[in-house]
Amino acid sequence: MSTGMTAQAGVDTFGRVGVAMVTPFDQDGALDVSAGRRLAAHLVDNGVDSLILAGTTGESPTTSLDEKLELFAAVKEEVGGRAKLCAGAGTNNTATSIEAARAFADAGADSLLVVTPYYSKPSQAGVYAHFTAVADAVDLPVCLYDIPGRSGIPIETETLLRLAEVPNIKAVKDAKGDLVAAAPLIQETGLAWYSGDDGLNLPWLALGASGVISVIGHIAPRALADLYVAFDEGDIARAREINAKTLSPLVEAQGRLGGVTLVKAALRLQGIEVGEPRLPVTAADAEEIEALRHDLEKAGVL
């Protein structure tokens, strides 16, 4: 329960401490549903109150819709009563995104994450039409995912202001990193705002974000939850300490390895097996694993 330092918009739908969960594979590269159940339970047991499935960190480009739905169903059965479940439905194909959105709605998702269409670089008119088509196709809250470093284009301010008027568009996951531009939009739109960049979690909370959607939270879920609680209770010194001592070394490691490679290697070092990434994403090599071991020890999570 919040005590008031953090924004409350959207938390009943999207949660506060979210992790964009990896998709576990077995040694043959097939979906490992049992490992998915175990990982989801581990994260929720350690303070995570929202899981984002089938997102970029879930290797959405290299998993089929059937695989996504199978993992979602298993995770919902495992932790659905204890955490919010947000499903990644966005692609660079509007029709495919609508198909996924409807399938996840039928599967019982609490909300959807829809990324800016990537690679094809549509106009802002196309971005608006894409998001509204997906949102109109389902009766679920939608979180827009603004990540121009991957999509190639941003959601521009005027487009976002128009999208905020769509009834079931309720939130933004911001991985653009432009805090100055976002600060007035958080107030003006009334949308729930979520940090999509672990290195900026504290600044986003200070600007009025409702929570975080994290990658490194896989590796240090309790620390991430503790950071949120400390900030919410007004113990900024404690939040800074957690961020500096535990989370910052993991952010640095992510910068070297990338999210999926980092998480899967780190979880293995922690004794949680989730397999290796699917190509074209590669597993960490021996040298990278040794450096990562040092990072985890420095962070106090190994």
UniProtKB/Swiss-Prot annotation:
Q: Which InterPro entries match?
A: Aldolase_TIM, DapA, DapA-like, Schiff_base-form_aldolases_AS, Schiff_base-form_aldolases_CS
Pathway(s) it belongs to = Amino-acid biosynthesis; L-lysine biosynthesis via DAP pathway; (S)-tetrahydrodipicolinate from L-aspartate: step 3/4
| Protein's cellular compartments | Cytoplasm
**Looking at the UniProt record for this protein, which Gene Ontology cellular component terms does it annotate, in alphabetical order?**
cytosol
Spell out the Pfam families in the cross-references: DHDPS
Q: Catalysed reaction per UniProt?
A: L-aspartate 4-semialdehyde + pyruvate = (2S,4S)-4-hydroxy-2,3,4,5-tetrahydrodipicolinate + H2O + H(+)
Positions of pyruvate binding: T57, I213
Class of this enzyme: lyase
**What are the residue positions of the site described as Part of a proton relay during catalysis?**
T56, Y119
Residues at the active site? Y145 (proton donor/acceptor), K173 (schiff-base intermediate with substrate)
Which domain of life does this protein belong to?
A: Bacteria
Question: Which pairs are disulfide-linked?
Answer: none
GO molecular function terms attached to this record: 4-hydroxy-tetrahydrodipicolinate synthase activity
Q: What is its main location?
A: cytoplasm
Q: What is its EC number?
A: 4.3.3.7
Q: Identify the keywords attached in UniProt to this record, alphabetized.
A: Amino-acid biosynthesis, Cytoplasm, Diaminopimelate biosynthesis, Lyase, Lysine biosynthesis, Schiff base
- Any one Gene Ontology biological process term? diaminopimelate biosynthetic process
Has keyword Lyase? Answer: yes
Question: Which protein family is it in?
Answer: Belongs to the DapA family.
The entry's function note states: Catalyzes the condensation of (S)-aspartate-beta-semialdehyde [(S)-ASA] and pyruvate to 4-hydroxy-tetrahydrodipicolinate (HTPA).
The annotated subunit structure for this chain is:
Homotetramer; dimer of dimers.
Q: What is this protein called?
A: 4-hydroxy-tetrahydrodipicolinate synthase
Question: Lineage from the top down?
Answer: Bacteria, Bacillati, Actinomycetota, Actinomycetes, Mycobacteriales
